[in-house]
Amino acid sequence: HPIRPDSYREINNFYTMTVYEKGAEVIRMLQTMLGKDGFRKGLDLYIQRHDGCAVTCDDFIRAMADANKTDLAQFSRWWSQSGTPRVTAETSYDETTRTFTLRGRQATPATADQKEKEPLVIPVSVGLLDGAGNDMDLVLVDQPDAVPEKTKTLILSDEADEWVFKDIPENPVLSLGRGFSAPVVFDYGYSREELAFLAGHDSDAFNRAEAFERLVLNCLSEMIDAAEHGDDLP
């Protein structure tokens, strides 16, 4: 069910992990998108308008939008659309132009209550690591005057989009979904070597732990498969 169900049989239906844990992650996404200062401005306006009142999710999101002069109408789908989105990523590196392209595609599987799904607003925080494990400076080709960042938060709001980073001196290792930037499944075809590299070098603690866990699970899966088929353990 979505964070804010359209109906319920009894009030206990609201005391679920979806409402409380996913709901909290959706609020945290706003901070990721708006920045800490922008989120604080929205929270101040929300309290100024509604302190002591009975309010709704719509009142909260409206205060965030008004304080930051931005449109959050599509973001509101997080409250009404059920299911866990999957973001599939593909990358390519052009040595001649020194550009790195990241392509992202989102899809939310049909659920029992909702067959048709609409694109959500998904913040995707990424980093690029060089061969020594250092974070590269990130600037998008279409934002040449932007201040370089070690972690860049991209916004995936359509079904698919792509971003091109400039002045990338070598083929980097992608650190995808830093800080668990959205409650989605990030799908990217990491090799065992890339996972080991991220586990040892990624500056983002969440992704470093995630890479180590995936690496261990992959190794265990291979060992179990080998044992079942009577092969030598890898």
Give the residues covered by each predicted segment:
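Hydrophobic alpha-helical and helix-loop surface patches within well-folded domains
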Residues: 1-92, 100-102
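Short capping/connector residues at structural and topological boundaries
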Residues: 8, 20, 92, 159, ...
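Conserved short-loop catalytic and cofactor-binding motifs
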Residues: 48, 122, 199
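A very general structural signal that marks isolated residues within well-ordered alpha-helical segments
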Residues: 33, 81, 108, 217-218
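Juxtamembrane/interface motifs at transmembrane-helix termini
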Residues: 60-63, 94-95, 227-232
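Long, ordered, helix-rich scaffold segments
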Residues: 16-17, 166-234
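A generic structural signal for short coil/turn motifs at secondary-structure boundaries
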Residues: 51, 111-114, 222-223
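Beta-strand-rich binding/interaction modules
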Residues: 71-74, 84-176, 208
